[in-house]
């Protein structure tokens, strides 16, 4: 089985200059934890995850808490977060895979790197995203005990 067989095609993406609030809203509305960050040419430039957003929100809060009072801390963190762009919190230079790579290889990369997803790139452009859930769904369809069940409705 290849990555192409399991990946999410045409994943939801975000621009590096989008406000962090837009990333939060998009992830919440679309119920995703990973957003590939692409430039205006569709080239992958990085990834922003729910973990990146938590770090962007809470790291300044801790610094503020240690250096100021609690009331001023919350006001300052809110203002800082509102001014931040995706590029300020995203991960640059992410590990990628190709559509034709074996899914087992992509899964091994995800496990070893502790990645929740891998962008799928062809010719420098994002064509898909393979997530932990995609790998589990693909695995579930190969197990004899669950063959015949619809993984989109029966298991999740």
Segment roles from a protein language model:
Residues 1-156:
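Tandem CBS (Cystathionine beta-synthase) repeat/Bateman regulatory domains
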């Amino acid at each position: 089985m290849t990555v192409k067989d399991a990946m999410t095609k045409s994943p939801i993406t975000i621009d590096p200059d989008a406000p962090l609030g837009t990333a939060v809203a998009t992830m919440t509305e679309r119920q995703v934890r990973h957003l590939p960050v692409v430039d205006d040419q569709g080239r992958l430039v990085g990834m922003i995850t729910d973990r990146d957003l938590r770090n962007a929100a809470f790291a300044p809060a801790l610094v503020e808490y240690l250096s100021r009072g609690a009331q001023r801390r919350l006001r300052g963190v809110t203002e800082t977060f509102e001014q931040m762009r995706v590029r300020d919190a995203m991960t640059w230079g992410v590990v990628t895979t190709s559509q034709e790579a074996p899914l087992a290889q992509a899964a091994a990369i995800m496990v070893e790197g502790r990645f929740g997803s891998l962008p799928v790139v062809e010719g420098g452009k994002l064509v898909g995203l393979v997530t932990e859930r995609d790998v589990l769904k693909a695995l579930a369809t190969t197990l004899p005990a669950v063959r015949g069940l619809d993984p989109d409705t029966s298991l999740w």
